[in-house]
Amino acid sequence: GLYFDLAARTEEQKRRVREHVAALTDHLIDHGFRLVDHDGKVTRWGTFDPASLNHDPEWWEERSLNSISILSYLKVAEHITGEPRFAEAARKLIAEHSYAMNTLIAKTPFGPGSGNQSDDEMAFMCLYNLTKYETDPKLLAMYQQSLRQRWDVELPELCPLFNYVGANGLKQSAGDWLGESLDTLERFPLDRFNWALKNSHRKDLVVLPGFASDSGDRVRGHRRNGQVLPIDERYVNQWNHDPWRLDVGGDGRHLADGAAFLLPYYMGRYEGFIKD
C-alpha cells in the first residue's frame, strides 16, 4: 500500500503495482483463501480460509494472526485497485465468519518474554494497513483494539518499529514509548557484524523462568525495570529477533543489513514522531 501511495510516481508504475497486487489477491480468493504453490499444495502458513481458522483445532493458534493478515491483504488490494470484489470478499469473511472479531483474540502471554516476535511483526505490519485504510468506524475501532492489546505486550521490548506502528494506528503522539524509541535509534550499533555477546552473568538482570517460552537452553531475562536490554547491549538482525535473550553466539562472519534501523527511522519521520 505504501509503495503505491508514496513510491510509484508514474501511472505506468502504479499500473504494474495494481496488476501485481490484484493477481496475488485474486489467487487467494480463487483458491478459497489459501496460498497454493506450483505443486498444488498449500504453503506452510498460507491458510486463511474460515473452515481451517474457525473450525480446525490444528489452526486455532493462527486464527487471530491469519484473520488479520487476510483482511489486510484484501484492504490493501481494495485501496490500490478500487475493485469491489476485494471489499466484497472481506465483507463476507467479516459478516459470515467473524474475521473482524477474530482479530481481537490476541495471544495470551505467559508473562514477560513469552511472545513470538515473528508473529508480532506480521501482525503489526498488517494492522498498520488496516488502521490506515479502514473507513468503517466500527471495524476501525476493532482493529485499533487488536493493535492496543498487542502493543501493550511489546512495549517492554523498546522496539521503535512496533512503537511507531502502534502510536500511528491509535493516534497517539506522546508517551514513554516516544523517548524510548528515539533512544533505541540513537544507540543502534553501526557495526552490523554478529559478534558474540554475553549478559547472563550480570547481577543487575532478572532471569526469566523456563516456562515463559520454549527457548531450550537459552538464558533470557530483562532489566529490573521490566524492560529488555538497550539495543547496543544485544545483537539485532531484524525486529523478529528475541530481545529477551541475554547471550548471543556469533563469530563476526555475518553482516546484517541496515533495514532494522532504516524502516523505523523513516517511518518515524514520515508519521511525525521524529522531528528535525
Regions found by a protein language model. Name each.
Residues 123-276:
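Terminal, non-catalytic domain-edge segments
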Residues 1-61:
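Extended ligand-binding groove/face enriched in aromatic
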Residues 6, 30, 34, 76-79, ...:
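Positions within ordered alpha-helical repeat solenoids
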Residues 11-12, 81-83:
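Short coil/turn connectors between adjacent alpha-helices in alpha-solenoid helical repeat scaffolds
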Residues 19-39, 85-107, 142-162, 223-243:
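Long, well-ordered core segments of solenoidal/helical folds
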Residues 43-51, 99, 112, 149, ...:
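Charge-rich, low-complexity amphipathic helices
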Residues 56-68, 74, 82-155:
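Long, internal scaffold/assembly segments composed of regular secondary structure
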Residues 3, 24, 73-76, 126:
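Short, hydrophobic/aromatic alpha-helical segments in well-folded domains
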